[in-house]
Amino acid sequence: MFLKVGHRGAKAYETENTLESFMKAIELGANAIELDVRISRDGRLIVSHDDNLKKVFGKDVRISDATLEELKHMTEDRILTLEEVLRTVGKNVEKILIELKDAGYEDKVLDLIRKEKLEDRVIIVSFLEEALARVRDLDKDIETGLIYAKYKNPIGAALKLHAQYLVPLYRFVHRRDIAKAHKSSLKVIVWTINSLIEARNYMAKDVDGIATDRPDIFRKMVNVTPDRK
């Protein structure tokens, strides 16, 4: 199954990592979503790429310095907990890519995934090898993926972490890299492609998924073969 991943939802059209953004991605044809998780001052799992609210919500406040109640108030309830996303969106997509922005709360994330019975739908991804190693120590079966831009030996690192996915910045991955990954039983999801031309190019290179801010680009790919839809 080819993964059409809504990057932070459909952030080209809605505010990133909000319910509106995730639902828009699904409406536009995404069969997977990607989101980012941080932890609040009171230990709640918050869906946000940045640790500061300024860029998205215009408030110069760090998530790690605020409680969930304070964050909800400052964002007019638009900021979400991971629990809210999993309960609302979890059964409406084939996969949810949960990016750990920091290490130290892997157990909380896994507990919530198990609580919502979404173990088969989640891929935990991160730039942080220590976070992925901790996830694997805690759960031998859940899928994980190593995110990277430039990396000398990503396949070796992913295999050492017992990960199933490589999640590279698309500009730094080539057809031969994808073929090598597949030979090592690793799947490849590239980020972030917003051009129809580039999406076609990387599908031709045999990637297993594309993360995009514009999930509607997949609808325009009339040359996608049936087994890649």
Protein language model regions, located:
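C-terminal active-site rim and adjoining tail of enzyme catalytic domains
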Residues: 72-79, 146-229
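Alpha-to-beta junction loops
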Residues: 30-31, 140, 206-209
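Conserved N-terminal beta1-alpha1 strand-loop-helix module at the mouth
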Residues: 1-60, 77, 112, 121
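Alpha-helical segments flanking ligand/cofactor-binding loops in enzyme cores
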Residues: 19, 23, 87, 133, ...
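Metal-dependent phosphodiesterase/phospholipase catalytic core, i.e.
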Residues: 42, 49-150, 161-164, 168-170, ...
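Non-membrane alpha-helical structural segments and their capping/turn regions in soluble enzymes
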Residues: 15-19, 79, 83, 103, ...
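Conserved SAM-binding loop
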Residues: 14, 98, 124-125, 190-192, ...
